[in-house]
């Protein structure tokens, strides 16, 4: 079985070798852990973001920069294609580990989750486990993790602190923005899973999403980065569905973000109206704008949802002069 942490460790090695070119900073903590700053104190950028995205996906996807037409504006975008969608996106990329140690908080994603089984129920559902001597994690945070954070991660992953490797970037950074848009395929799979679809039948996934500019602080950028997927994220999945075509159509109909009661305005406005409480925001909103599925069993293709660039332009706050 593929080891996501082994795959991720190869990406980390590349990041260490190319740190100067990536405009990142490598930090060695006293307990031996390796931290790669991709946008907190370091400048980072598009290439650092690409490496972050590769790391999140355990290098099990083909990633390319592209462009997206936002009502006549050619906007930077990222394409994701994978033939290991469940392992790449759910066993690795999914941001399923809330890490809170003292005054430190970050959202953990990437390979190390598979060692810590974060969350355990998901790994049981997809039948995946990893066994590797190093833990490779991507952290979305505005602070660099210290020794106490590393010790917490090492304990949960059953590895030595010196074998913990963390790449970190804040939401309000170019690298952070890139890796969030690269979650476009994963958000669709997660939405499928949340409505009772057997995600193990998903054989491949492709997606494209614009990359948000820096519009403000981390909370404001959380809005614009999510909007990239919610309003202009497009995904295609190949599945081998055991069931009637009508049942598959019903699943596909329920996946796009357009089905959410909170759909229709920039996410920051929705989040602010909910007093910045995620639990008051409809979770169904976190999905691609348009989803297309090709079923290998029925030899049919189904599509649902649509793209809404005008809302994304509002979210970005673009001023034409």
Swiss-Prot record:
Q: Where in the cell is it found?
A: Cytoplasm
Q: In which pathway does it act?
A: One-carbon metabolism; methanogenesis from CO(2); 5,10-methenyl-5,6,7,8-tetrahydromethanopterin from CO(2): step 3/3
**Alphabetically ordered keywords of this record:** Cytoplasm, Hydrolase, Methanogenesis, One-carbon metabolism
Documented EC number(s): 3.5.4.27
Q: Pfam families, alphabetically?
A: MCH
Q: Which GO terms describe its cellular component?
A: cytoplasm
Q: Does the keyword Cytoplasm apply?
A: yes
Its main localization is cytoplasm
SUPFAM superfamilies hit by this protein: Methenyltetrahydromethanopterin cyclohydrolase
Give the top-level enzyme category.
Answer: hydrolase
Catalytic reaction equation(s)? 5,10-methenyl-5,6,7,8-tetrahydromethanopterin + H2O = N(5)-formyl-5,6,7,8-tetrahydromethanopterin + H(+)
Q: Which InterPro entries match?
A: METHMP_CycHdrlase
Q: GO molecular-function annotation terms?
A: methenyltetrahydromethanopterin cyclohydrolase activity
GO terms, biological process = methanogenesis, from carbon dioxide; one-carbon metabolic process
Which family would the database say this protein is a member of? Belongs to the MCH family.
Q: What does this protein do?
A: Catalyzes the reversible interconversion of 5-formyl-H(4)MPT to methenyl-H(4)MPT(+).
Q: Which protein, by its recorded name, is this?
A: Methenyltetrahydromethanopterin cyclohydrolase
- Source organism (scientific name): Methanosarcina mazei (strain ATCC BAA-159 / DSM 3647 / Goe1 / Go1 / JCM 11833 / OCM 88) (Methanosarcina frisia)
Classification lineage? Archaea, Methanobacteriati, Methanobacteriota, Stenosarchaea group, Methanomicrobia
**What is the name of the gene encoding this protein?**
mch
């Amino acid at each position: 079985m593929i080891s996501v942490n082994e795959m991720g460790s190869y990406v980390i090695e590349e990041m260490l070798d190319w740190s100067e070119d990536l405009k990142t900073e490598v930090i060695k903590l006293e307990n031996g852990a390796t931290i790669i700053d991709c946008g907190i104190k370091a400048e980072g950028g598009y290439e650092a973001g690409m490496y972050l995205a590769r790391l999140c996906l355990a290098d099990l996807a083909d990633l390319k920069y592209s462009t997206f037409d936002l009502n006549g504006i050619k906007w930077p975008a990222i394409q994701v294609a994978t033939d290991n969608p469940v392992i790449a996106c759910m066993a690795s990329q999914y941001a399923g580990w809330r890490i809170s140690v003292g005054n430190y908080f970050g959202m953990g994603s990437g390979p190390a989750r598979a060692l810590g089984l974060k969350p355990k129920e998901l790994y049981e559902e997809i039948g995946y486990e990893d066994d590797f001597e190093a833990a490779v994690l991507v952290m979305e945070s505005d602070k660099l993790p210290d020794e106490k954070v590393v010790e917490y991660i090492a304990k949960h992953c059953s590895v030595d602190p010196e074998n913990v490797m963390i790449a970190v970037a804040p939401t309000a950074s170019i690298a952070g923005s890139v890796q969030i848009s690269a979650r476009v395929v994963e958000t669709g799979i997660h939405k499928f899973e949340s409505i009772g679809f057997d995600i193990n039948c998903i054989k491949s996934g492709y997606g494209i999403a614009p990359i948000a500019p820096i519009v403000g602080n981390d909370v404001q950028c959380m809005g614009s980065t999510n909007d990239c997927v919610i309003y202009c994220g497009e995904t295609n999945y190949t599945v081998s569905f055991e069931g009637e075509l009508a049942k598959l159509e019903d699943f596909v109909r329920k996946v796009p973000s357009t089905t959410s009661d909170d759909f229709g305005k920039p996410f920051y406005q929705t989040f602010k109206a909910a007093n910045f409480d995620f639990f008051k925001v409809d979770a169904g909103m976190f999905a691609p704008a348009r989803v297309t599925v090709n079923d290998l069993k029925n030899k049919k293709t189904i599509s649902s949802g649509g793209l809404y660039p005008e809302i994304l332009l509002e979210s970005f706050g673009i001023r034409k002069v």
